[in-house]
Each structure stands twice: as C-alpha cells, then as structure tokens.
C-alpha cells in the first residue's frame, strides 16, 4: 500500500518493497523487543509521517491502543486509508502539531508510551513527545548513528521534562548495514 501511494504523494524516500519492509516495518517493530511496548498499553506516535513506528506496532500488537499524530493532513488521510484496507478500526488519527496537542488536557500525560522516528533532534523531540507521557510511562525513540551525541545534548531537556535515561538498544536489521538505535526514557515527574 505504501509503495503504491508513494507514487502519488511523497510519503517516503524508500520505494523498493523489500527496503520498505526492512527499513520501515522491521525497524519499527524492533521497539517491542525489550518489552517496553506491550499489548494493552496506550501509545502516541508523534510526527508519524507514513505511520512509522505506530502502524506496524499496532499491527503486531492488536491490543495496543494507538494514536497517530501528524501535522500534514495528506499523511493522516493515507493512514486512515491503510487502516480501512487492513481492517483496523480502533486507531485514533490526529491532524495537528505536537506542540498544540501536548498542551491539551485530553492528551497531556495520557499515554503509557510516546514514540517518534525521524522527526527532530533529540532535545526538541523530547519537548514534543514527553508532555504526552504519564508519570511512570516511557518515551521510546528510534534514532540513527548520532544517538550518543544527541543524548549528550539532551541532558538539560531531560532534567526540565522530568525524564530519566534507561537504555540504548542497538538494532541490527537483516541485509542492511545501518546504525539504528532505540533510546528509552522513563518519565519520573511532571
């Protein structure tokens, strides 16, 4: 579906089906491997774009309550069409900006998990995502080869936002030599 729609509108720079599967789907569900994201939890995917990692996480965990947030309506329309085609009717789709919805009492501190992938540098990403997370919940972000540097640059943001660094998980994807990481943080205060 993604490859087909990508011909009409730019959703991803990756167009080969096998690459889409490995770099988008497998990369997205790798966040499940350590048990931070489980069935029964509530998750918001901030800046979801073409639905990564939120949509693959919902497909692989059918009882995960997922909210997909993106500032571009064309992406939200695409994701609604995908959900219809694969018969998933319990995802919430939000067209809007994280900065606005993170202040909304209907969304602020309402989620067990906030995720993001390829949205912004880590300090800004924390400011976008952490307001959605309940105290005791986690911010789980997928980052590339500069994860350690971004982590160093985020110490002040972590302190201000009330989160603690838990771990960096190195991700190895089949047939592709990419340096991908998952950074996990726990919200300890609001």
Regions inferred by a protein language model and the residue ranges of each:
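Class I SAM-dependent transferase core
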Residues: 1-40, 44, 74-91
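A general structural signal for well-ordered alpha-helical segments in protein cores
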Residues: 2, 25-28, 54, 151-154, ...
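Short small-residue beta-strand/loop micro-motif enriched in glycine and branched aliphatics
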Residues: 11, 63-66
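Predominant activation on well-ordered alpha-helical scaffold segments within soluble catalytic domains
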Residues: 29-32, 58, 186
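Short conserved AdoMet
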Residues: 38, 62, 134
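Conserved glycine-centered beta->alpha loop in an early N-terminal alpha/beta scaffold
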Residues: 47
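Conserved SAM-binding loop of SAM-dependent methyltransferases across substrates and taxa
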Residues: 50-63, 127-130
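S-adenosylmethionine
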Residues: 65-67, 71-190
């Amino acid at each position: 579906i993604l490859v087909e729609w990508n011909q009409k509108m730019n959703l991803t720079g990756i167009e080969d089906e096998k690459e889409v599967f490995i770099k988008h789907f497998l990369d997205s569900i790798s966040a499940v491997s350590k048990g931070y994201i489980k069935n029964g939890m509530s998750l918001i995917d901030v800046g979801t774009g073409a639905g990564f990692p939120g949509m693959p996480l919902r497909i692989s965990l059918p009882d995960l309550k997922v909210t997909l947030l993106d500032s571009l309506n064309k992406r939200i329309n695409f994701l609604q069409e995908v959900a219809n085609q694969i018969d998933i009717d319990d995802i919430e789709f939000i067209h809007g900006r994280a900065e606005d919805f993170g202040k909304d009492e209907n969304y602020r501190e309402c989620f067990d998990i906030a995720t993001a992938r390829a949205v912004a540098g880590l300090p800004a990403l924390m400011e976008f995502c952490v307001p959605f997370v309940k105290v005791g919940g986690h911010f789980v972000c997928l980052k590339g080869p500069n994860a350690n540097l971004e982590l160093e640059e985020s110490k002040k943001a972590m302190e201000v936002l009330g989160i603690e660094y838990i771990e960096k998980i190195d991700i190895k994807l089949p047939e592709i030599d990419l340096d991908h990481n998952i950074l996990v943080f726990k919200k300890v205060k609001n």
